[in-house]
Amino acid sequence: MNSVVRQMWEQNTDVVMVDTGNSYEGLCEYVGGKYISYTEEHPITMNPFAIKREELNIEKIGFLKNLIMLIWKGTQGIVTKTEDRLIEQVIKEYFDEYFVNRRIENLSFNTFYEYSIVRIPQIIEENKLSGIDLAAYNYLLKDFYKGGSHEVTLNENLDTKLFDETFIVFEIDSIKDDPLLFPLVTLIIMDVFIQKMRIKKNRKVLVIEEAWKAIASPMMAEYIKYLCAPVKVAS
C-alpha cells in the first residue's frame, strides 16, 4: 500500500490517511508530509459546529446528527425515528438561533450542548414524547463539554494550515481500543477530508486502512453516505 499511496502523491493527488500502526511514518517523512499522532496531551481536535451559513446543508446536518448520536448511543446503539428527528430539529434550531436570531454568541459544541439540554425537554413536552433517555443524553455529552475529560475534542478549531498540506497521516493507534474515541476521531478526520476536498480542486484520496473497524456499524454507515455525496459531486 505504501508504494500505491506514494505513486498517487507523485501524480499530484492530495493524500489523507488514518493509520493505526505507524505503517506510514517513513513514507510521510520521505515526502515531507504532516504526521499527526493522537496523544492524551495533544488530541486531534475540531470544532464541527463552526461553519458558515452557506455550509449548512443536509450533509452537514447529517454529519452533526451522527456525531451527537455516536456520543449518546455508541457505535452499536439503536436510534429511534423519534430520537433521530428530535436531534435533527435541535441542530437546525441551534443554527437558526445563531444565524437568524443572533441569540448564540459563537458556534461550538459547548454552546450546542447548552442550547440542547434546555431545548430538548421543551420539545419533548410540546409534542408529548416518551421513551427518550434525557438523563443519559445530558450525562454522556457532558464529557465533551467544558470541564469534561474530552472538553477540547469538539471545541478547539483545527489548524487550517493542514488544508495546504498534500500528504497528511493521522496516527490514532493509542485510541484504537477505545469504543467511543476511536470512531469519533475517525469521523473528525473524515470531515477534515471533506473540507479539504471542497477547498482544493486537484484529486484527493482518503485512506482509512485498519481504521475501517471504527466505522463498521449501521449507525456509521449513514455517515459514509454523507461522505460519498460530495465526493460524487466533486468527481
For each feature predicted by the language model, list its residue ranges:
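Glycine-rich phosphate-binding P-loop
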Residues: M1-V5
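Post-Walker A helix-loop "phosphate-sensing" segment adjacent to the P-loop in P-loop NTPases
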Residues: R6-V16, V31-K34
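Conserved functional hotspot residues or short segments at active or partner-binding sites
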Residues: D19
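P-loop NTPase motor domains
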Residues: N22-K34, E40, N47-V233
